[in-house]
A protein has these predicted regions:
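Beta-strand signatures of extracellular beta-sandwich domains
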Residues: 55-59, 100
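Short beta-strand/loop motifs in extracellular/secreted proteins, especially
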Residues: 52-54, 95-97
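Edge beta-strands of extracellular beta-sandwich domains
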Residues: 107-117
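Short, surface-exposed binding/anchoring microloops in extracellular/periplasmic proteins
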Residues: 20-53
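Short, solvent-exposed, Trp/other aromatic-anchored flexible loops in extracytoplasmic proteins
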Residues: 67-96, 102-106
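N-terminal signal peptide c-region/cleavage motif recognized by signal peptidases
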Residues: 14-16
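Bacterial N-terminal signal peptides that target proteins for export
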Residues: 1-6
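A short, structured loop/turn motif at beta-sheet edges
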Residues: 31-34, 58-65, 89-95
Length: 117
């Protein structure tokens, strides 16, 4: 009985901690010429200037940054929200990138893998 309660409490604590991190919920990517544009939808419990989603990046699977979109202000009343980044150069032959969101308190959230077509 104690083990089940402890596991439940730990699971809830983990969920609460993760709920504060930004989450990418949708990505659309399009290629034009030699570069890509990404429209990324982020969900985060922005509370104001003290804690908000402050950016997201486009990365290769090895962690190499291809581009970064700074979010200059909180989106307290606009959740989830979508912002775009264009002119991202993706190396030839790469068919997968990872979008990683960031917030001003917890740092990076979980990556969202995108297959490029």
């Amino acid at each position: 009985m104690k083990t089940g309660v402890l596991a439940t409490v730990l699971g809830l604590m983990t969920g609460m901690a993760w709920a504060d991190s930004p989450v990418v919920t949708h990505v659309s990517a399009s290629k034009s010429g030699g570069s890509w544009s990404f429209s990324v939808t982020v969900k985060h419990g922005d509370t104001g200037w003290d804690h908000y989603a402050d950016g997201w990046g486009v990365y290769l699977e090895d962690g190499t940054e291809l581009g970064y979109r700074v979010l200059h202000h909180p989106h307290v009343d606009e959740q989830p929200f979508t912002r775009s980044l264009s002119s991202v150069k993706v190396p030839q032959g790469v068919d997968t990138v990872v979008i990683v969101p960031r917030d001003s308190v917890h740092g990076t959230g979980e990556g969202f893998t995108v297959k490029l077509r």
